[in-house]
A protein has these predicted regions:
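N-terminal [4Fe-4S]-dependent radical SAM core
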Residues: 3-4, 24, 39-109, 114-135, ...
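Core AdoMet radical
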Residues: 117-146, 150-172, 186-204, 208-246, ...
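Short, electropositive alpha-helical surface patch
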Residues: 173-182, 214-217, 270-289, 344-359
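Surface-exposed amphipathic alpha-helices with a cationic face
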Residues: 177-186, 209, 249-257
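Conserved C-terminal portion of the radical SAM core fold
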Residues: 214-215, 220, 224, 242-302, ...
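Flexible glycine/acidic-rich beta-alpha junction loops that bind and position SAM and/or redox cofactors
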Residues: 225-236, 268-271, 289-314, 327-353
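C-terminal accessory regions of radical SAM enzymes
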Residues: 312-396
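C-terminal non-catalytic accessory extensions
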Residues: 384-416
Length: 416
């Protein structure tokens, strides 16, 4: 698992306890040489895949396509036994994260993403880092065969299919989903869909449910329309629109129902805490959940020069989000300062202290697993931070972790 260092301006980061909008502008995408566009050289070389492909930019990538091939996270590959390695603090991941793959790659150009279209200038799609780690490519049939041997005893509590912006994304998602559910029942390992709203319809949302998915998520990522446009839309020559993402999110609300849909949100790209927590409340009021990521500059992205989210900003939002999502605290009961930072969480000091000491609020958030509704199966080990300064804990925080979290929150004194 690769862990890239934050290349942001340390002085800027030290001076602020939040990332303001004006300081988080992405670079302008550069033009890709014609011969590198749409995976042309990968298709021209047409090297046949030989089983598992481990990303290596020093070799010509083989010609791999979904639905026959999918990529999976480094953590999932280690847990599945496909590649060696260990993860700090945890022996496995509880979510089998799958990613559709094509030589053409993702046709969107999101500023913070390692899979963005502009990266075709220097790196094949199969070799790009995503959420800070490599994603080996594996035949889907091999993955199903391994898990289907004994799904009830599998370490995985959930499987997730991540779509990308590609003309075949919907149809191939249906094929991969059916291949899985034909062999592995949802009671043993439920399935989530991380959707691509730009190319989807309401009928597509319905079909994922009909084929056995139990949870549907939309990666809003940006907390406001302006931030979305700057990082995911025309600001970076990308096709996504805030309105279309919300259209599919509301379709998921209708089709999947309360507790079975949600949205990804990245904290620290220029929104205020007030803005992101009002979005969290809006999702809860619809019956959904928020799945939060701490911004960490992805190597090779258009934002890899920018500072990671300061830990105090992240911890405030993490804690407030948990209270809204799982403890029935409303954002209207919270207080914010003139910069939109949380100053009061809307509950008493003793109750707040108990929530902090339990530690669950600071674990990775995502679709639920089999332990508790508020403990995510999708633990994404170190996907938004290095192990030396953990943002989202993929394991239960220990006593020393909670002491550090309290310092980051500015709440050092435990109330008895």
């Amino acid at each position: 698992m690769s862990c890239f260092e934050n290349r942001g301006d340390a002085a800027t980061q030290a001076a602020n306890d939040y990332n303001p909008f004006e300081a988080m502008a992405p670079r302008t995408p550069s033009k890709t040489p014609v011969e590198r566009r749409n995976g042309r050289h990968v298709k021209a070389n047409d090297i046949p895949p030989q089983g598992v492909y481990l990303p290596n930019n020093n070799y010509l990538a083989p010609h791999m396509r979904s639905p026959e091939y999918v990529q999976l996270s480094t953590a999932a590959a280690i847990t599945l036994g496909i590649m060696g390695g260990r993860m700090y603090g945890c022996s496995c991941t509880r979510c089998l994260n799958l990613l559709l793959t094509y030589p053409e790659g993702c046709r969107a150009n999101c500023a913070y993403c390692g899979l963005a279209r502009h990266r075709e200038a220097d790196r094949d799609y199969a070799d790009r880092n995503f959420i800070r780690v490599d994603w080996p490519a594996v035949p889907m049939a091999d993955i199903v065969e391994i898990v289907a041997r004994d799904p009830a005893s599998s370490p995985f509590h959930r499987m997730c299919i991540s779509m990308i912006t590609h003309p075949r994304s919907e149809q191939d998602t249906f094929t991969v989903l059916k291949q899985w559910t034909d062999r592995i029942g949802p009671d043993a390992i439920p399935v989530s869909i991380l959707s691509n709203p730009t190319t989807m319809t309401r009928d597509d949302v319905q079909r994922t449910k009909d084929l056995g998915a139990d949870t549907f998520t939309v990666a809003l990522d940006a907390a406001t329309p302006a931030l979305f446009d700057r990082t995911r839309g025309k600001g970076v020559q990308s096709p996504h629109k805030w309105s279309k993402y919300w259209e599919i999110l509301l379709d998921a609300c209708d089709v999947f129902g309360p507790g079975h849909f949600g949205a990804h949100i990245i904290v620290g790209m220029g929104e205020t805490e007030y803005e992101v927590l009002h979005l969290v409340q809006e999702l809860v009021d619809l019956g959904g959940h928020s799945h939060m990521f701490c911004f960490f500059p992805e190597q090779g992205s258009l934002m890899d020069h920018l500072p990671a989210t300061p830990r105090d900003q992240w911890r405030r939002v993490q804690l407030a989000r948990y209270l809204i999502d799982y403890r029935d605290v409303r954002v209207d009961a919270m207080r914010f300062d003139s910069a939109g930072r949380v100053t009061d969480y809307g509950i008493g000091a003793a109750e707040l202290s108990a929530v902090i000491d339990e530690g669950v609020a600071f674990r990775t958030s995502g679709c639920p697993g089999k332990f508790r509704d508020d403990i995510s199966a999708c633990d994404r080990p170190f996907g938004d931070s290095p192990p030396s300064d953990i943002a989202s804990y993929p394991f239960q925080p220990k006593s020393r972790d909670l002491k550090k979290i309290r310092r980051q929150l500015g709440i050092p004194v435990r109330v008895e």
